Regions:
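Histidine-acidic metal/acid-base catalytic patches
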Residues: 2-3, 8-16, 29-33, 56-65, ...
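Active-site-proximal loop/turn and secondary-structure-junction residues that shape catalytic pockets
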Residues: 8-10, 25-28, 40-44, 71-75, ...
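Active-site proximal beta-strand in glycosyltransferases
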Residues: 35-38, 131
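Glycine-rich anion/phosphate-binding loops
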Residues: 43-58
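Extended recognition/assembly regions associated with phosphoester-bond processing machinery
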Residues: 51, 81-82
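Active-site groove signature of glycoside hydrolases
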Residues: 62-79, 103-106
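Generic enzyme active-site microenvironment
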Residues: 103-105, 130, 191
Length: 215
């Protein structure tokens, strides 16, 4: 399954494609039939008000598949793990009651760039993981996946993040090993996370061709 991540303040949608709606870009909760799930706004999850915000989002997206969240803003190195787990447990229990899968995303820097931290939190609160390929160096991707594989629900697909920008693949030479491994662990939801429409469509075309040949 291939989806397109909506990452625009204008809130564009592809009427004929599955969409992951980025509330961190456009906070309006749109409920079109082709929207599978949502990416939450970036919040300080140590604060109780963030619990209220996430529960309100979940209440409003009932009937959709998942909500992906960041554990922090990408720079935090010191995390109050106990309070983080306490707050996320409340959010995840509410998500489960509403049949929404809560997914935590690995980031390029900070606490959740460490796969051991990600899997510890996911196991502790019994939630899922959004595996962001481009947030992980090429030579660490398979190791990261191996540690987190039991909890991965979906993946963000693009070449790599550099200087805060998601780069598109020119081909799938670098992505094929991790795409193979994701399919091997039954992660079949590839969400293309790019900003440029032409880059999105070109990447989608390459992934479609790749999926025809995967064995």
């Amino acid at each position: 399954m291939i989806g397109i991540c909506m990452r625009s303040k204008k809130g564009y949608t592809f009427n004929n494609k599955l969409v992951d709606w980025g509330l961190h870009y456009n906070p309006k909760i749109v409920k079109k039939n082709n929207i599978m799930g949502y990416h939450a706004p970036i919040l300080n999850l140590i604060k109780k008000e963030s619990v209220f915000i996430l529960k309100n989002i979940i209440e409003n997206i009932k009937g959709k598949d998942y909500l992906t969240i960041h554990l922090h803003n990408g720079k935090n190195k010191d995390i109050d793990k106990e309070l983080l787990i306490e707050n996320l447990s409340i959010v995840n229990e509410f998500a489960i009651k509403n049949n929404v899968k809560l997914c935590i995303e690995n980031l390029r820097e900070g606490f959740s760039s460490n796969p051991k931290n990600i899997i510890e939190i996911a196991d502790e609160i019994n939630c899922f993981i959004t595996f962001d390929i481009g947030h992980i160096p090429y030579n660490k991707r398979l190791e990261f996946l191996d540690i987190c594989s039991d909890r991965i629900y979906n993946s963000h697909v693009y070449e790599i993040e550099m200087n805060g920008k998601h780069l598109p693949p020119k081909n799938l030479n670098n992505l094929k090993p991790i795409l193979d491994a994701l399919l091997d662990v039954k992660c079949k939801m590839f969400l293309i996370e790019l900003m440029d429409i032409n880059e999105i469509l070109n990447t989608e075309k390459m992934i479609k061709e790749y999926l025809k040949t995967y064995k």
